[in-house]
Swiss-Prot record:
Glycosylated sites: N36, N229, N266, N269, N417
Signal peptide feature range: 1-14
Protein name: Lipase 9
GO cellular component terms listed in the entry, alphabetical order: extracellular region
Active site: S194, D343, H376
Gene assigned in the entry: LIP9
Compartments, record wording: Secreted
Induction comment from the UniProt entry of this chain: Expression is not induced in medium containing Tween 40 as the sole source of carbon. Expression is up-regulated during the yeast-to-hyphal transition. Expressed during experimental infection of mice. During host infection, expressed in gastric tissues, but not in infected oral tissues.
Amino acid sequence: MLYLILFLIAPIYAGVLLPTKPSIDPFYNAPEGFKNATVGDILQFRKTPKSITGGFVPLNVQNSWQFLVRSEDSFGNPNVIVTTVIEPVNADPSKIASYQVSENAARADCAPSYALQFGSDVSTLATQAETYLLAPLLDKGYYVVSPDYEGPKSTFTVGKQSGQAVLNSIRASLKSGKITNIAEDAKVLMWGYSGGSLASGWAAALQPDYAPELSRNLLGVALGGFITNVTATVEATDDTIFAGIAANVLGGIANEYPEFKSILQNDTNKSSIFNKINNHCLTDSFIKYVGARFLTGDNKVFKSGWNIFKNLVVSKIVKDNGLVYQKQLIPTIPVFIYHGSMDQISPILNPKKTYQNWCDAGISSIEFAEDLTNGHFTESIVGAPAALTWIIDRFSNKPPVDGCQHVVRTTNYEYPNVSSSILDYFKAAMDVVAQQGLGPNIQKDQLEIKSNL
């Protein structure tokens, strides 16, 4: 009888618990007159409808909000993005970590603002898992800001849209003092891995011209599993167990460029597959397209195969969205790159080329920590303590490297002074699982869970 009751009430219970998906949530819609707002303006805000997720448990933090922010697409057309702001217990209003999660999908319902909420769909599990990477930032007392940088069209791997969204999210956060208590002159570090590195890297490269006023706030950017050439990522993943990434790259670019989409549509052997590319978040794409041949072999999805990249329109679009080709865009803030030599998603050649381009242009500070024994997925874990160490040093006003430094290590667990950050990760993970408060100097009477279940 008990099981029958549970079976009958489960749909009702689930309806109460689950956050609303962006595609049917009116909060994500641009309000009337939004085009007249300035980029970075907060158009509306709310508490996150559900608690921030820790996977199977909610995070115990002080507060969390969603902002609807005025931004723009790759062509300068006005649009809106949603950004999530998380306040830890005993937060430091002078420090912000802008953490770009690796959404790596071309569907609105995969957006970080949705995926970071407790109860979000299992298809967003890869994004949910990144809360364990950002948890130590909260434990240090930093506000964490995470934008839906792909924008309302879900333009995965589209550089300009993504970078501008990150910068406008930071602008909004710095204006949010009356809501969040963040100081207007707060210092900001950007960090992203995989798709999040693409957005963060573009933000750093665009910032001197697009958001020059942020120079007084930005302390640097950490880039892991750094994607700088989208064609190389498609080449590396097509006809492999990671072919879902190739699908999502093509779908994301098609969402921003109608002419790109039209060329793909007219070249397809399997329209049913192409038309469903945007139906999946990353986890689903991996499962759905394992071993898929979009451009390889006889039974490929696109007739032209790799020759499609010789099409002048396609070639220009993919190069316009590859940071490795943008030699005129040079960050003026310190840069930290950590990357596995065995990366299966973003082969290390292109991050190295981007590093060299920036060095040749005279960048003031860039550090490349190459990990000999790890690939894309393992480096996201192994390299994270090195990135955290670098970020803590920047917030502590320690000087970054002068000029360019590329160091190859057996593993980035050998990064200097990394041991304390490794312990920070273990502590934060245990705090998440035990639903302990995330933040510095927490007293026992502050451990009540701030839940929006």
